[in-house]
Swiss-Prot record:
One of its GO terms (molecular function) is magnesium ion binding. Mg(2+) binds at S102, D241, D243, D245. It catalyses: alpha-D-glucosamine 1-phosphate = D-glucosamine 6-phosphate. It comes from Yersinia enterocolitica serotype O:8 / biotype 1B (strain NCTC 13174 / 8081). The keyword Metal-binding applies. One of its GO terms (biological process) is carbohydrate metabolic process. The gene is glmM. Keywords: Isomerase, Magnesium, Metal-binding, Phosphoprotein. This is Phosphoglucosamine mutase. Binds 1 Mg(2+) ion per subunit. The modification Phosphoserine is found at S102. Catalyzes the conversion of glucosamine-6-phosphate to glucosamine-1-phosphate. Its EC number is 5.4.2.10.
Amino acid sequence: MSDRKYFGTDGIRGKVGDSPITPDFVLKLGWAAGKVLARHGSRKIIIGKDTRISGYMLESALEAGLAAAGLSASFTGPMPTPAVAYLTRTFRAEAGIVISASHNPFYDNGIKFFSIDGTKLPDDVEEAIEAEMEKPLTCVESAELGKANRIVDAAGRYIEFCKGTFPSELSLNELKIVVDCANGATYHIAPSVLRELGATVITIGCEPDGMNINEKCGATDVRLLQERVLAEKADVGLAFDGDGDRLMMVDHLGNKVDGDQILYIIAREGLRQGQLKGGAVGTLMSNMGLQLALKELGIPFVRAKVGDRYVLEAMQEKGWRIGAENSGHVILLDKTTTGDGIVAGLQVLTAMVRNHMTLHDLCSGMKLLPQILVNVRFSGDHNPLKSENVEEVTRQVEKELGDRGRVLLRKSGTEPLIRVMVEGDDAESVIAEMANRIADAVKAAG
């Protein structure tokens, strides 16, 4: 990917009120995107958002920009990111736009685009939009201005789509499920999907107020879900992030089940059913335990760069159908075009029901190696990873680990953070000490 001025690995993101997440910038972005997308013929755009209070302001700005370029907008209201991808396909819209900062706090927001086929916008189109941003905004003739409307049945359409990914001969009648929607975009979707498939559902994180999205709940903080699963004696817990493209789970014993374990369960079930095509794609952050467990099953495994767009690229290159990040982005190309927390959760529930096994038992074939991740914030105007001291400390740790572990240092694609990951088969306290040693060097350099 070439250097961009605005687009990162997952669209454009930042703090609301600071450039680029300002009303004037987003209006110009809508206009620039409209000018580029209008070249392809269709003049219809789907716009969805999560539950952040700033979503109202930003969707109005986007719609004004699109209208000035002659494109019409169809609003879905609060809707998971994968739902917008699905609706973009079914409405044959030229593009889908999601207003969300995913797992970030409410004061952040972002804009990301989907193509007509429900996949992330290609690099060359994003670059064309950036080029258009440099031009002065002009308005089409009055008769050619875009219009706006609401898709009143958007939620119902997506609920039926999700249910269709669960086998019709099975039901969730025997399961008691706690679902945590992070006070985000799945709050009015996920509970309905699970209830309509027969489950007894207890909800948390389903009362968004515009400011409580991802706050001590959802896929990035499952402590509340763990407590509730144990208190309710539930069979399983599902946690989504603010825009519904990530999934974390909790077993009946209160143990967290991450994206690596979810990928393992889905891959193994695909193998059992004779439906697995090729292998599975993880990332540089995927636990070595996943790689070893898949190898034992004879399932090929490759690592992509971190970021769901890179997982998808690797899947497409290989012709494989399943991939995931340990953060909970799970992509199942036989069912969806992008990461979908609800659909991924339904595939794990399918394995539980079909095999009469608990989530804990389904995870038992994979042993997670201790993996410590430390996030170090830096000023953003230089790269601490180029520090000689950081390189020297990293070499020392790698020498201590030998072939029993690995070190990964990388810059976040969305925030001014250096992520320090150390993994190995030593005791967790030993691995943590190694990670903190490197993190201290990064802090000193930052």
